Amino acid sequence: MVDTCFLSRGLTTLAGLLLLPFGSLAASQIEDQAEQFFRSGHTNNWAVLVCTSRFWFNYRHVANTLSVYRSVKRLGIPDSHIVLMLADDMACNPRNPKPATVYSHKNMELNVYGDDVEVDYRSYEVTVENFLRVLTGRIPSSTPRSKRLLSDDRSNILIYMTGHGGNGFLKFQDSEEITNIELADAFEQMWQKRRYNELLFIIDTCQGASMYERFYSPNIMALASSQVGEDSLSHQPDPAVGVHLMDRYTFYVLEFLEEINPASQTNMNDLFQVCPRSLCVSTPGHRTDLFQRDPKNVLITDFFGSVRKVEITTETISLQPDSGVVESSYKKDQMVEELMEPLKYAEQLPVAQIIHQKPKLKDWHPPGGFILGLWALIIMVFFKTYGIKHMKFIF
């Protein structure tokens, strides 16, 4: 009997030792999968959207920026991760036939200047200096959080710019310019300070491709609406407003983005094809040599949408609850109902009495010394002015 017991215990121990490596291997595989899942790419997305133009005839540039702003918000990037810079307020311009609105299509169905637009830099705050400070993080400590780009080395950043430009420069409010060298150096500072993981640069301006020619920092993908020597043309003229409502390149990019949802598998190669020369009239360009990943493996939502740490599975998972847990939960709910039963606040409050009760009459108090003195002064002035003989006309 004793030998049998020892034999059984020995077999159990041997089986445990044999299964231990398999259990450790399974646990190790699960840990590796979890680590790979949370280590993938980036953890947050940011957007810096800049309109550099002022004056009414540049209405389309404000509409461009606000339309991109609406698209990235729709795809999940919150306002806390968007820095919006508008050089002019077209919604409140005296020439606007529909005040407090900005439209990007001549059918006037969608107001892109809605109630939830949060402009971080407006009017004369939109300068080259402020733009570069936002990118590099070299801003005063008193600057509010909404005006900061609080990105890190796990951040994917979308930078969209629109306005008037030339070969190697972009104008800010017709008063200053940013060159492609200054922009390239700012991106290098961002990389050295670990302020981005990957960066997507989009510019809609004349000769836009010249702005990304000097880039040299890694993990940057750039798109432009026109090549060097070409103009970026406008779109959607509206007789009521008196100007064009959008630029061609941004119009077709946004038309493409309207078909995207947060779970979309559309990649960047599709974005490169949205505005051929037949539609844009100009020749859009892109640069991917600094980018480490193949554009066909880069999802649109990697830059335009929110980061969702969700993994879809087709496995069947049993959700049979423990009977003891169910019973305990039932008892807890029953106790809560018993506690809440007598607390019928609406019936306890004497609402009718409070609303309809008569106002309390104030007790009468004799006038103070100041009031009596004031009346005495009035009577003295009266007698001094009119005398006793006029009293008969009063009484």
From Swiss-Prot:
Which GO cellular component terms are attached? GPI-anchor transamidase complex
**Stretches assigned to the Cytoplasmic side:** 386-395
Role description: Catalytic subunit of the glycosylphosphatidylinositol-anchor (GPI-anchor) transamidase (GPI-T) complex that catalyzes the formation of the linkage between a proprotein and a GPI-anchor and participates in GPI anchored protein biosynthesis. Recognizes diverse proproteins at a C-terminal signal peptide (CSP) region that lacks consensus sequence and replaces it with a GPI-anchor via a transamidation reaction. Transamidation catalysis reaction follows a two-phase mechanism.
Q: List the disulfide bonds.
A: 275-280
Domain of life per record: Eukaryota
Its annotated pathway? Glycolipid biosynthesis; glycosylphosphatidylinositol-anchor biosynthesis
Q: Which principal EC class is assigned to this enzyme?
A: transferase
One GO biological-process annotation of the entry reads:
GPI anchor biosynthetic process
> Which range is the signal sequence, renumbered to this chain?
1-27
Q: What is its main location?
A: endoplasmic reticulum
The name this protein goes by in its record: GPI-anchor transamidase
One of the record's GO molecular function terms: GPI-anchor transamidase activity
Q: Check the record and name the InterPro entries matching this protein.
A: GPI_transamidase, Peptidase_C13
Q: In what way does this protein cross or attach to the membrane? A: Single-pass type I membrane protein
Q: Which residues cross the membrane?
A: 369-385
Q: What is the species listed in this Swiss-Prot or TrEMBL entry?
A: Bos taurus
Family matches, as Gene3D superfamilies: 3.40.50.1460
* Span list, region Autoinhibitory loop: 231-236
Give the E.C. number(s). 2.6.1.-
Q: Which residues lie on this side of the membrane: Lumenal?
A: 28-368
